[in-house]
Swiss-Prot record:
InterPro entries: EutP_PduV (IPR012381), P-loop_NTPase (IPR027417)
Miscellaneous section: Encoded by the CP4-44 prophage.
GO molecular function, one term: ATP binding
Lineage: Bacteria, Pseudomonadati, Pseudomonadota, Gammaproteobacteria, Enterobacterales
Organism: Escherichia coli (strain K12)
Biological-process GO terms, alphabetical: biogenic amine metabolic process
PANTHER family given in the database record: PROTEIN YOEF (PTHR40453:SF1)
This protein's name: Protein YoeF
Pfam families (alphabetical): PduV-EutP
Length: 118
């Protein structure tokens, strides 16, 4: 439009919870197919995130739940978090640990299938 000055800007997806907002752009895919993020969160934050009306919510897309840092948790804690992720809408729940490389290969394999593709 003539006479209108356009300012350059770039939208950065943010994950908001009761603990604050996470806006690190390298934690997200920006191709519109999938929003991947990792963040320490309790079930209240997960439920709150699903209730937020944003273009980044899951809607009718598949949801993958990932339990991270499994090497630091007990089996009871991992089981509890897996149930929270299922309650929050995750169809696939994977348990990972980067320290001993457990579950990482399975996560990447799932992300490269039609089932896991968002």
């Amino acid at each position: 439009m003539a006479g209108v000055r356009q300012h350059g800007w770039r939208a950065i997806p943010a994950v908001c919870s009761e603990y604050g907002a996470d806006t690190l752009p390298d934690r997200y895919r920006s191709d519109g197919r999938c929003l991947l993020f990792w963040q320490q969160a309790g079930i209240s934050a997960l439920k709150q995130e699903l209730e937020v009306k944003t273009p980044y919510r899951a809607m009718n897309h598949p949801v993958i739940g990932v339990v991270t840092k499994a090497d630091l948790a007990s089996m009871e804690q991992i089981s509890l978090v897996k149930s929270w992720l299922r309650e929050a809408g995750a169809h696939n729940v994977l348990v990972t640990s980067a320290v001993n490389n457990n579950g990482v290969t399975e996560l990447f394999a799932l992300l490269h299938t039609e089932e896991g593709c968002c």
